[in-house]
A protein has these predicted regions:
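Mobile cap/lid helix-loop segments that gate and shape the active-site cleft of serine hydrolases
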Residues: 25-68, 73, 88-95, 104-108
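Short, conserved active-site loop motifs that form the nucleotide-linked donor/cofactor pocket
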Residues: 1, 76, 112-113
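Alpha/beta-hydrolase-fold catalytic nucleophile elbow
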Residues: 4, 29-30, 79, 117
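C-terminal catalytic histidine-bearing segment of alpha/beta-hydrolase fold enzymes
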Residues: 51, 97-140
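Alpha/beta-hydrolase fold nucleophile elbow
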Residues: 1-7
Length: 140
């Protein structure tokens, strides 16, 4: 079983991968950031979208990349858009760094692929091909 999604579907995919041993690989497009960056107003967004995803009390102990990292050492692909207004690159890069540290500590850094593509908040044909290639490589 693999989990894949874009936007809120991506959020669900990495959450499911982190919490279920049945999921053997995961792909998430346009949903990874650190909470501190997502909930700030300094990026000029009218709506920062993070409050809907804040699990009460959990942020005291774990941030989004910490939760996603519970999936290590599973093969996981994260794709972000460099012009995605919902997920500022500062937070994406910070989250990716945290996750790479965990996969590295698990001896499986090669199982984590993180990308920042020239795109907005979308799952385009290039992303879909990357997902299919990643899953073909990791779950066949």
């Amino acid at each position: 079983i693999a989990a894949a999604g874009c936007s809120m579907g991506a959020y669900r995919a990495w959450m499911l991968s982190a919490l279920s041993d049945k999921v053997k690989a995961m792909c998430a497009v346009c949903w990874m950031v650190t909470t501190d960056v997502q909930l700030t107003t300094r990026y000029g967004r009218k709506e920062n979208g993070g409050f809907a995803n804040c699990i009460p009390g959990l942020r005291l102990f774990l941030d989004y990349p910490d939760i996603a990292s519970l999936a290590a050492p599973k093969p996981s692909l994260f794709i972000a858009g460099d012009s995605d207004k919902l997920f500022p690159l500062d937070g994406v890069r910070k989250a990716y760094s945290i996750m790479h540290s965990v996969w590295k500590d698990a001896g499986s850094e090669s199982n984590l692929e993180t990308r920042i593509e020239a795109q907005p908040h979308e799952c385009n044909i290039k992303n879909q091909k990357a997902i299919l290639d990643f899953l073909d490589k990791n779950i066949k």
